[in-house]
Amino acid sequence: MRTLEDSSGTVLHRLIQEQLRYGNLTETRTLLAIQQQALRGGAGTGGTGSPQASLEILAPEDSQVLQQATRQEPQGQEHQGGENHLAENTLYRLCPQPSKGEELPTYEEAKAHSQYYAAQQAGTRPHAGDRDPRGAPGGSRRQDEALRELRHGHVRSLSERLLQLSLERNGARAPSHMSSSHSFPQLARNQQGPPLRGPPAEGPESRGPPPQYPHVVLAHETTTAVTDPRYRARGSPHFQHAEVRILQAQVPPVFLQQQQQYQYLQQSQEHPPPPHPAALGHGPLSSLSPPAVEGPVSAQASSATSGSAHLAQMEAVLRENARLQRDNERLQRELESSAEKAGRIEKLESEIQRLSEAHESLTRASSKREALEKTMRNKMDSEMRRLQDFNRDLRERLESANRRLASKTQEAQAGSQDMVAKLLAQSYEQQQEQEKLEREMALLRGAIEDQRRRAELLEQALGNAQGRAARAEEELRKKQAYVEKVERLQQALGQLQAACEKREQLELRLRTRLEQELKALRAQQRQAGAPGGSSGSGGSPELSALRLSEQLREKEEQILALEADMTKWEQKYLEERAMRQFAMDAAATAAAQRDTTLIRHSPQPSPSSSFNEGLLTGGHRHQEMESRLKVLHAQILEKDAVIKVLQQRSRRDPGKAIQGSLRPAKSVPSVFAAAAAGTQGWQGLSSSERQTADAPARLTTDRAPTEEPVVTAPPAAHAKHGSRDGSTQTEGPPDSTSTCLPPEPDSLLGCSSSQRAASLDSVATSRVQDLSDMVEILI
């Protein structure tokens, strides 16, 4: 509710400002009446809100007057209640409005006037102060409200006087409904007349700041206030002693009752009775008593009958004095806060002034804009009239142009008929020419179709020729593969023939050696039998002959087993050779097929270009095959050279013989066990050569996994050297044929039986070594 009241007051305030600046007097009065009614409603409901609102809307000049008028009142009237507001309202209703030339009352006059009516209201119940001299909590609250209403009454009286005076000076007589407790600051600000009050005719008036509590009035001020003709001109006996009522606010309720009795006696008699001497001695009225009262006061002080009552009253006065001092301090603090509020009000008024100036500038700008709009509107009207005239001229021109166009169209229709006849004749001729051209086009289309069919036939013939060429190339490739196979088979056959020749030579040598050994053994037997028969010991030669025959039988069995192993390894070699050859043939055919598929799937943009490209690709393939054949032939020659070098190296190193024990006559020779153990000799060959040389060894070990070698591994000096194609394997330092020869039979003649057995063992081991060398050569 407080916010709504403030907002409504602000809106009314702005409206009244605008009306004061730009409106007429009747509307201004109406708005002022509305504001006064609204503020009256706020004073009736809010209590203490209306005086603050009246203070906030006063002008800076009025705020200076109100700073003097808002002196904190003493709170000695505990007996005053809510009736003060009614008394003030009745006071302002009964008070006649001052005329146009009447001067405003001073602060002391207005305060004395309000205190008089407050004292009249309090006179009906003088026993309230006797019942509760110290003041209960409810009584103190009523005293605060009474003092607040009293201060608000002073402010209202001054604001009403200022408002009425400003309205009269502006030439407007204020209506009766505007005499309320609130004013408007714009009236005081717009007031530019003479000051509110001039000095009286009797002399200058000493009108200083409002008295602060405790206040002591000087004697000459009291005499001037009493002898002031304005108090006597009021027509009421209560204004003759205004200074007594001014100081009633500083006297406690007990003295207020005595003062009221004193005033009553003073009004009824010319020489009033004096007040109590103790009260005048200790209260603030002791310095303000008139000279006519001093004699009765001194006479009253000499009486000793009421001493105890006076002492009690003096204690009560002292207590009230202390309480009033505390109230005075509190009221001084309130005065400081009200001064701060007044400063804020001044700032607010300056802000309102700035806003009003801004509003004036806006109104000037709006007036300029309206003038500019008016000129632009006039200009637009003239432009519209000009455009309407121009549009009228254009319509007339359009009508004349339409008339001319209609006449021209009639003439054009007459000429167009002649043109149509000519065009019909020309179209007939063009149709005949078109039919002739269509016949020629049909003939050309037939010729084009014939040429297309001929081209298709040629393309088919070209495709057939290309297919025949591709088939011929495939056949040529197959024949070349067959030729390569034949060449490889011939080379293998040559190698086999060489191996067979070597084997035959070895067999011949072995046969001759065995025959020689047999002859030597027989000769030894005969020689051994002859000395035995002569000596008569026939048991030992028979035993030696039996032993030798058994050894011979064992050797023959070993030889037969080795021969069987040799034939077996020859068969395996041939099988591996054939399988390797077939794998190479399959790889060659797969490469040829891949080349043919690439050639077939290659794009052929045109028949002639495809035929030429086919020829070129065929030539390239022939060249590639020739280069491949040359490379293979070079590899074969290189391998043959390596084989020859290895053979020569094996012949150069005759001193390296391999010793190894014989195993039972089974299948696998000891060569491959030695190859598995002696891997140090492979360091001189490349990785590819090692792989090709290891292939047959892996095959043989896979085929015979269950066979266990019995022969011990050869020493590290014995190492295999394989050829580049992996077709043959030879030991690094093979023994020469001379090392394989048996010892001479003559050397065994003079030896004993043990020596002969050792020699036979050595011969057998040499034979086994020769057989292993032969098997390696064959492999």
From Swiss-Prot:
Positions with biased composition (Basic and acidic residues): 100-112, 141-152
Record field: compositional bias (Low complexity): 160-169, 298-308
Keyword terms, alphabetized: Cell junction, Cell projection, Coiled coil, Cytoplasm, Endosome, Isopeptide bond, Phosphoprotein, Ubl conjugation, Wnt signaling pathway
Stretches assigned to coiled coil: 308-581
Chain intervals for the UniProt region annotation (Required for interaction with CDH1): 220-307
Free-text description of this protein's post-translational modifications in UniProt: Monoubiquitinated at Lys-347 and Lys-408 by Crumbs complex-bound WWP1. De-ubiquitinated at Lys-347 and Lys-408 by USP9X; the interaction may be promoted by cell contact inhibition. Deubiquitination of AMOTL2 negatively regulates Hippo signaling activation. Phosphorylation at Tyr-107 is necessary for efficient binding to SRC and synergistically functioning with SRC to activate the downstream MAPK pathway.
Chain intervals for the UniProt region annotation (Disordered): 41-215, 263-308, 522-543, 679-753
Phosphotyrosine PTM sites in chain numbering: Y107
GO molecular function: actin filament binding
Marked site (Required for interaction with YAP1 and ubiquitination at K-347 and K-408) residue numbers: Y213
Site residues by UniProt (Required for interaction with MAGI1 and ACTB): Y107
Segments for region (Required for interaction with CDH5): 101-307
Any single biological process term in GO: Wnt signaling pathway
Sequence similarity: Belongs to the angiomotin family.
Function statement: Regulates the translocation of phosphorylated SRC to peripheral cell-matrix adhesion sites. Required for proper architecture of actin filaments. Plays a role in coupling actin fibers to cell junctions in endothelial cells and is therefore required for correct endothelial cell morphology via facilitating transcellular transmission of mechanical force resulting in endothelial cell elongation. Required for the anchoring of radial actin fibers to CDH1 junction complexes at the cell membrane which facilitates organization of radial actin fiber structure and cellular response to contractile forces.
Entry protein name: Angiomotin-like protein 2
Source organism: Homo sapiens
